[in-house]
Regions:
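Solvent-exposed loop/turn segments at secondary-structure junctions
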Residues: 52-55, 76-80, 130-134, 161-165, ...
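Glycine-rich phosphate/pyrophosphate-binding loop and the adjoining helix
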Residues: 12, 29, 182-208
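Helix-loop-strand module that forms the ligand-binding subsite of alpha/beta enzymes
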Residues: 89-178
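C-terminal motif of bacterial Sec signal peptides marking the signal peptidase cleavage site
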Residues: 16-19
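Hydrophobic helical h-region of N-terminal Sec-dependent signal peptides
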Residues: 6-14
Length: 208
């Protein structure tokens, strides 16, 4: 009788005992090291700029207020040159040399060594002034050296000028970065819209 009672109790409570068992949790495999690095590097952005008057530096400040990016300033190797003197005579001669022989490394003015490897980034935003309708010579020097390493990367271009149109600067960028994936519209900051640059930059960034 005792045995019969024990069997009955087990039969009665077995559903309850089964329901209280802890169900093993599914374990999601951790990504391997390579996958983890790919996730961490996704969307990494580099802002490259050259600024003589300070206008492009101000544009970069607006950019970094809106996005997480690393910044690289391009600097001429020769310090203290006044590019604005004598109606921008120095800048004009530098641009003329590049126009004459755009495929000759000797046509481009020397710049200081850079400390960023562009291959580490997925997106590159170039901020440059306009000189005599073209891209400023120091920025052209940088892109002549590094443009081939930007193949397949998303490229954004912001050009600062007083009033001149930027079509030749866009052409310079595409010549120097022939395999870049350019954002459809480049951003033109000029004397008439400069006071509203923060809003213009924010709207432009939404196109990425």
């Amino acid at each position: 009788m005792i045995r019969t009672l024990a069997i009955s109790l087990i039969t009665l409570f077995s559903p309850f005992l089964y329901s209280c068992q802890k169900t093993p949790e599914a374990v999601t495999p951790a990504p391997d090291k390579e996958q983890q690095e790919q996730v961490e590097d996704a969307g990494k952005t580099l802002i490259v700029y050259y600024s003589f008057s300070g206008d492009c530096r101000s544009i970069v400040a607006s950019l970094t207020a809106n996005i997480d990016a690393e910044v690289l300033e391009i600097q001429p190797a020769e310090e203290g040159l006044n590019y604005a003197a004598n109606n921008y005579a120095i800048g004009s001669s530098l641009i003329a040399a590049i126009r004459e022989k755009p495929n000759d490394a000797a046509s481009y003015p020397a710049i200081k060594p850079v400390n960023r490897n562009v291959a580490d980034y997925d997106t590159v935003i170039i901020v440059t002034p306009l000189w005599w309708s073209n891209m400023a010579a120091p920025m052209q020097s940088y892109l002549f050296q590094k443009g081939s390493k930007m193949a397949g990367k998303t490229i954004g271009l912001i050009v600062s000028s007083y009033s001149s149109g930027i079509s030749s600067v866009v052409a310079d960028a595409k010549r120097l970065i022939p395999e870049g994936k350019f954002v459809e519209e480049s951003l033109w900051i000029n004397n008439s819209n400069r006071s509203g640059k923060d809003g213009l930059i924010k709207n432009w960034l939404s196109s990425f």
